[in-house]
Amino acid sequence: MAGELRIMENKSREDINLSPVSKIEIYSFFDPFSSDCFKLSAILSKLRIEYNQYIRIRHILNPSLKVLTKCQAQSTSNFDNIALAYKAAELQGRLRAERFIHLMQNEIIPKRDIITKSMICDCIQNAGIDLEVFKDDLQKSKLTESLKIDLHIAREMEIEQAPSLVFFSEDVHEEGLKVEGLYPYHIYTYIINELMGKPIEKNLPPKLETYIQQQQLVTMEELLTIYEWPEKLLNKELKKLAIQQKIEKLKYPDGDFWKSKMPKIKSK
């Protein structure tokens, strides 16, 4: 897979006033329209499951001219501009904003759909975000300022493409490691283990049923990444859940997806 591993100087983080973290901080720069970014989200979900006590992931919509132009071209107003919508969602919590962008990618990437106001509303509510507060926040000029801050961060870290991950240890005097492009899962776990500098224990993933209920829409590739089961075994378990009317299979141009028919698990 294409990509670049590059050491960065630590000044990129020191120049930015961000809350400190106790262990490893990962900056994830993404393009909401990129299929590689969509694939990386499965890897990040697995990292968060297995290494939750050791890492903190911060998602930043890559505010490059190319990405922002695509966001503008897909929109008719601030309401359906996904860049501004993501920044407004962040005001109600980063985890909810991440959930929102994941739901949006589930809509626009496999279906190749155009972004609409109703799509934004559905994903906002499904992410546990207050819709009325979100609408008010969309009118605030500070969203544009927030995008400018993200642009500053991206420039300081010399981000040239999405997806890109930047790993920092808890020592601000240590250099960061930038990974551009998409790599196999073990590359990211190797980096985490090297930065920790000691043996660390991994957490087990939740039950398959629970994970699909949390995510609502998942790809086969995502589930294979999370669970590392043989594809034949995974298909067998998915068929069991389908027979129980807990999930259903959907076919899209970019492949098959599995959708939860179970009640949504509310975001905290």
Swiss-Prot record:
Subcellular location: Cytoplasm
Pfam families membership: Thioredoxin_5 (PF13743)
Keyword vocabulary terms for this entry: Cytoplasm
Similarity section: Belongs to the SpxH family.
Subunit-level organization: Interacts with Spx.
Chain's role: Adapter protein required for efficient degradation of Spx by ClpXP under non-stress conditions. Interaction with Spx stabilizes Spx and exposes the C-terminus of Spx for recognition and proteolysis by ClpXP.
Predominant cellular place of this UniProt entry's protein: cytoplasm
Protein name, UniProt field: ClpXP adapter protein SpxH
Gene name for this UniProt entry: spxH
